[in-house]
UniProtKB/Swiss-Prot annotation:
Quaternary structure annotation from Swiss-Prot or TrEMBL: Part of the 50S ribosomal subunit.
Keywords carried by this UniProt record: Ribonucleoprotein, Ribosomal protein, RNA-binding, rRNA-binding
Family the UniProt entry places it in: Belongs to the universal ribosomal protein uL4 family.
UniProt keyword Transcription regulation, yes or no: no
Function: One of the primary rRNA binding proteins, this protein initially binds near the 5'-end of the 23S rRNA. It is important during the early stages of 50S assembly. It makes multiple contacts with different domains of the 23S rRNA in the assembled 50S subunit and ribosome. Forms part of the polypeptide exit tunnel.
A Gene Ontology cellular-component term: ribosome
Annotated region described as Disordered, given as residue ranges: 49-78
Organismal lineage: Bacteria, Bacillati, Bacillota, Bacilli, Lactobacillales
Full protein name: Large ribosomal subunit protein uL4
UniProt record, GO biological process: translation
Length: 207
């Protein structure tokens, strides 16, 4: 079992938290992490690209000239693909790029990125993040006390609305819960700031 220093909101040590090695101490599988990140990035694509094919382009209903006798190549419509202003052949149409990977693959990827952050000492555990009201300045003080000045993913327990609202307007800070933190978000973050309750939930979900 890996031990991680537990801090409070003021940056002082408040003990240690024991992490489950089956989740936070495995050998990262980079191939699986790569596959899941590609999948999650694909699902973020809007897929709203569209062009007009020859049936959608305005005009072109009349044959431009008669079939025979002009000496010119036969044409059926001025909106054929070879014409300027004609329809596009096999152009992109709106579609979803999302695809699913097996649950075992996604869970292994989560365990891999969590383990990597712990191994690189980029996993900061805090006993709680309690605020009486949404205060961005107060959350900024917490980050400063914990010496976090880079891209950070804050992983909270469910229902901690004040902490989530306090953090979301700070540049470089992204907020998620133990059940919504994605492999892409975790991999992109320079550090993870995780509450003790969120750690317990992560271990419950991925056990």
């Amino acid at each position: 079992m890996a031990n991680v220093t537990l801090f409070d909101q003021t940056g002082k040590q408040a003990g240690e938290v024991v992490l489950n090695d089956a989740i936070f101490g495995i050998e990262p599988n980079q191939a699986v992490v790569f596959d899941v990140i590609i999948s999650q990035r694909a699902s973020l694509r809007q897929g709203t690209h569209a062009v007009k094919n020859r049936s959608a382009v305005s005009g072109g209903g009349r044959k431009p000239w008669r079939q025979k006798g002009t000496g010119r190549a036969r044409q059926g419509s001025i909106r054929s693909p070879q014409w300027r202003g004609g329809g596009v052949v096999f152009g992109p149409t709106p579609r979803s790029y999302a695809y699913k990977l097996p649950q075992k693959v996604r869970r292994l990827a989560l365990k891999s990125v969590y383990s990597e952050k712990v191994a690189e000492n980029k996993f900061v555990a805090v006993n709680s993040l309690e605020f009486t009201a949404p205060k961005t300045a107060e959350f900024a003080k917490v980050l400063a006390a914990l010496s976090i000045d880079s891209k950070v993913l804050v992983i909270l327990e469910e229902g901690n609305e004040f902490a989530a609202l306090s953090a979301r307007n700070i540049p470089g800070v992204k907020v998620a819960t133990a059940t919504t933190a994605s492999v892409l978000d975790i991999a992109n973050a320079d550090k993870l700031l995780v509450t003790q309750a969120a750690i317990s939930k992560i271990e419950e979900v991925l056990a």
